[in-house]
Amino acid sequence: MSKIKRPICWEDVTTPSRLISDRKTVSASDIKQFGMNFDPQPYHLDRDAAKTSIFGGLCASGWHVCAIMMRLLSDKLTSEGIQFIGNDEIPKLKWIEPVFEDDSVYAEIQLKEKQRDPSNVDFGIISADIAVKNQRESDVMVLSAELLVKARQHHDA
């Protein structure tokens, strides 16, 4: 059983720093279920149709990869004790390679710099670059995000 870490608020997060998430293996069932519910393209639903697609095989929706990244990010920040609230904005998002069935992905999180949230005294913003990588260490998706983290102390807006 892992020890619960003390809460880390925005003021206490060290930047720059690098975090690595756990891995998530993406099954054919995961891909098809997400595809049926949210992105019903043939290459997300049918293995045979996917073979003749531009991707050449059953692959996850880019939005599915985003959802996986969000879970990996949230779990990692929470496990570190960081009081993560969510994302303020995502100014950059790029899909690079497909995530195929049975690929194992993880997130490499670079916490770059901190700034006060001018619109809310309860939060601070941490700029982050996140790369989702597969088991071959290839980037499958990269993004820049502004993470909202609970602030310990109120500050002047």
Residue ranges and their predicted role:
Residues 1-14, 98-157:
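HotDog/MaoC-like acyl-thioester-processing domains
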Residues 2-60, 151:
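Catalytic strand-loop segment that frames the active site of acyl-thioester-processing enzymes
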Residues 15-17, 22, 30, 41, ...:
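A generic structural signal for short beta-strands and their flanking turns/coil linkers
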Residues 20, 28, 33, 41, ...:
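A broad, structure-centric signal for solvent-exposed, well-ordered loop/edge residues
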Residues 57-60, 67-112:
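Hydrophobic beta-strand-centered segment that forms part of the acyl-chain substrate-binding groove
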